[in-house]
């Protein structure tokens, strides 16, 4: 292949930096610099301060971060439960029925998240299940949006499982429930933790559907960031964005460590 040659490796490295720096690294560095600024009228910010981070650690900002963490935790656990159950059920179906189930779970990802938010709002704004104005409608919307990723991740892991493990357990007298709990789920644990981390990260950054549903006492951090930038407080909003990124990365690092330990068992 081209990248096996010395020139190919150099070209790949140059292409990576040419694409990575302006498209990914530079915008994040700009947000980081803006979070410490009080003024930005030239190439670099001036009037450096940590006041924006001090404000982010108290009051409304801290409550919004807590709300985002709790919402993401609840949504990722629900999505992992539903997605795993559906993937296990789909594994026993025929190809045609499995394709239908795949399409149903992918549908919320195929449409704009604001459409999902509107659908959840309409569905849960009337009895018998009246959740409009509560935190639970936000959790449900996030769960609907991220369950597809849990389902796809677990489905892919199930296809890679060696059936010899299950056959060996069954030959020793283990029933279906015991095979599931003692063989399949432990083998799936690395994929389950990866799916949970992905669902958590996606939920932490969700905004479009959340804007349609959140009640005043349950404001996630992305909504607060949008509100800050909308009223012109770009530097304060940048600090909140850095806090959101840091919290998400720390959670993903924790999940990665759990996944590594599970993979080495």
Spans of features found by a protein language model:
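Membrane-water interface segments at the C-terminal ends of transmembrane alpha-helices
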Residues: 8-41, 54-159, 183, 187, ...
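Transmembrane helix boundary and interhelical loop/hinge segments in multi-pass membrane proteins
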Residues: 36, 46-49, 157-167, 176-178, ...
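Hydrophobic positions on the alpha-helical face of helix-turn-helix-like DNA-binding modules
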Residues: 168-169, 179, 183, 225
């Amino acid at each position: 292949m081209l990248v096996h040659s010395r020139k190919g490796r150099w070209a790949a490295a140059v292409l990576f930096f040419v694409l990575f720096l302006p498209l990914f690294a530079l915008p994040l560095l700009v947000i980081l610099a803006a979070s410490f600024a009080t003024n930005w009228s030239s190439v670099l910010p001036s009037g450096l301060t940590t006041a924006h981070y001090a404000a982010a650690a108290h009051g409304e900002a801290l409550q919004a971060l807590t709300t985002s963490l709790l919402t993401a935790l609840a949504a990722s656990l629900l999505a992992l439960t539903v997605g795993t159950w559906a993937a296990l059920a789909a594994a026993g179906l025929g190809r045609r029925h499995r394709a239908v189930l795949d399409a149903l779970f992918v549908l919320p990802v195929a449409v704009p998240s604001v459409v999902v938010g509107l659908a959840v709002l309409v569905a849960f704004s009337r009895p018998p299940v009246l959740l409009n104005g509560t935190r639970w409608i936000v959790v449900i919307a996030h769960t609907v949006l991220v369950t597809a990723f849990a389902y796809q991740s677990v489905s892919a892991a199930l296809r890679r499982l060696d059936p010899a493990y299950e056959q060996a357990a069954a030959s020793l007298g283990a029933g279906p429930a015991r095979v599931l709990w003692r063989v399949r789920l432990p083998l799936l644990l690395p994929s389950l933790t990866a799916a949970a981390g992905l669902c958590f990260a996606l939920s932490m950054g969700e905004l479009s559907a959340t804007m349609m549903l959140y009640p005043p006492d349950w404001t996630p951090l992305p909504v607060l960031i949008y509100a800050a930038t909308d009223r012109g407080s770009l530097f304060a909003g940048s600090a909140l964005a850095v806090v959101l990124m840091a919290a998400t990365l720390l959670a993903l690092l924790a999940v990665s460590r759990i996944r590594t330990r599970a993979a080495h068992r």
